[in-house]
């Protein structure tokens, strides 16, 4: 499927999605948003893709919603219409976090602000460099957090630190971002995408059904009590048996002291 506002590259079971509006620091317009939703659905159905990397073209990851677009400006009359108009902003978080049943990595080149920061937080992991910067920005627009930030940020950095970042709307530079957990890996800027790809290939090596179920189990664990989560873990183990070759291969390679070859079957 051709895209106008993003690039899609697939190699070695790893997909790289590059937001391509560099003149706008990859701000999310309605058209880009629709393509993000479409590429999520495409990658979900592609069994040859095991890990997805999100990044941005040019000098920024994503500066948030493009407020110059008519949809973002809000041409509506009633409160219900206003809610409908703003509702589209967060749907990419649902697609990436909930519906894209594959590990996701954000490679943060430059700034991730507002809904762009939320996009990064919706990914399972984040790789950055000394140029990476985060900014919640909503309070500066006389807005409360949206696009999933109020869900993701406290879970990643803790409640009080999340309040700090939202209330002050200050920039979080790369070193602090790494220290507080906004970034999981910090690499030289020239190696950013390679670093993300190295991480993706490490993940893609493992049995895909087990990886997919691990994502679901871990997500569920952030919202469940212990008893419910133990039941869901058991469900995950049973589900993983749907790939009998990989189950047998894991045991055989361990016995034979050789690297495993997982197929997803």
Residue ranges and their predicted role:
Residues 30, 95-211, 244, 248, ...:
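Crotonase-fold acyl-CoA enzyme core
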Residues 165-166, 177, 217, 221, ...:
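Helix-loop "lid/cap" segments that line or gate small-molecule binding pockets
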């Amino acid at each position: 499927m051709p895209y106008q506002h993003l690039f899609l590259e697939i190699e070695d079971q790893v997909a790289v999605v590059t937001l391509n509006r560099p003149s706008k620091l990859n701000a999310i317009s309605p058209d880009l948003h629709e393509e993000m939703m479409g590429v999520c659905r495409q990658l979900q159905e592609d069994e040859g893709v095991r890990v997805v990397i999100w990044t941005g073209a040019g000098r920024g990851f994503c500066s948030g919603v493009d407020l110059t677009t008519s949809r973002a400006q809000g041409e509506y009359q009633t409160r219900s219409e206003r809610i409908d108009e703003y509702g589209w902003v967060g749907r990419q978080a649902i697609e990436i976090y909930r519906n894209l049943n594959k590990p996701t990595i954000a490679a943060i080149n430059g700034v991730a602000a507002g809904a762009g920061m939320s996009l990064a937080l919706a990914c399972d992991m984040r790789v950055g460099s000394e140029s990476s910067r985060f900014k919640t920005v909503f309070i500066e627009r006389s807005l409360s957090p949206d696009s999933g930030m109020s869900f993701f940020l406290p879970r990643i950095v803790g409640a009080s630190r999340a309040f700090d970042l939202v209330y002050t709307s200050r920039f979080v530079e790369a070193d602090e971002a790494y220290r507080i957990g906004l970034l999981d890996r910090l690499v030289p800027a020239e190696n950013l995408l390679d670093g993300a790809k190295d991480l993706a290939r490490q993940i893609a090596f493992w049995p895909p059904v087990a990886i997919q179920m691990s994502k679901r189990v871990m997500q569920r664990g952030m919202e469940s009590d212990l008893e419910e989560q133990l039941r869901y873990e058991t469900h995950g183990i049973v589900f993983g048996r749907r790939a009998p070759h990989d189950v047998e291969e894991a045991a055989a390679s361990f016995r034979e002291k050789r690297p495993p070859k997982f197929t997803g079957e």
